[in-house]
């Protein structure tokens, strides 16, 4: 069983330290994981499906397989549905541009979901649909509150439904480094989680990132806390996707490490790892020894 990926790592968008936990748990499942590699051809033969590969460095190889699964994303169908015949502007790639009310360039036509752009996620599309429906209903009913609805989500969580699951939301550590954003990291290993140990699945990790810029924590009720608001977070472990919503809410509400750490989480649960990670960032966690200076 081989996995072929054109990019330099699996699960692009997630921090590499989270993905490495998944890789460690699953390396026995695969014969090869070929990174920086393109699939350039495939032919059916009596022996099986013969596939040709080419590395980004020009190296060529091939393999023969019983089955091949091609998973390369989706293409917007704005041109195929002939939206332009209704006057709707469609981009060269097939996307349809909308404003924050999900309205196209034609005032009475709305669009939501994958066709309006990334990220192509069902939970994003649902919220976009709510906005469009409220705006339409508000205008028909003369309800100004409904008619003023807008899609203004600060963050949209992502989940890789693997085993273990990988989930992340907001700013990632890799993005923070690339953008020169100083962050305070709180990392809680599930090896210190009673529930994870009892489940026999303590390989997981919960990570939270807080604003650690010089001006962080100077206002908005965060003065004297030594850090600013939460900017992002990620988890790898069983049911990570079920818990990432709490981190998304914390970002939307502008919470800091004290807010999250002092929120009482039920014990023993995997979800309390979020509170523990906040305590690690704040330096008040008694479940994990402080890092040596």
Regions found by a protein language model. Give the residues of each.
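FAD-site-proximal beta/loop scaffold in flavoenzymes
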Residues: 63-145, 216-227, 242-248
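A conserved FAD-binding loop/helix module that cradles the flavin
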Residues: 14-21, 25, 106, 112-178, ...
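Flexible, glycine-rich terminal cap/loop adjacent to redox cofactors
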Residues: 156, 161-293
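A short, glycine/Asx- and small/polar-enriched loop/turn
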Residues: 44-49, 106, 199-204
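A Rossmann-like FAD-binding core segment of flavoenzymes
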Residues: 2-100, 171, 178-183, 191, ...
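Structured loop/turn residues at beta-strand edges in well-structured enzyme cores
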Residues: 28, 63, 104-107, 154, ...
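Protein kinase-like catalytic core scaffold
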Residues: 2, 108-111, 204, 229-231
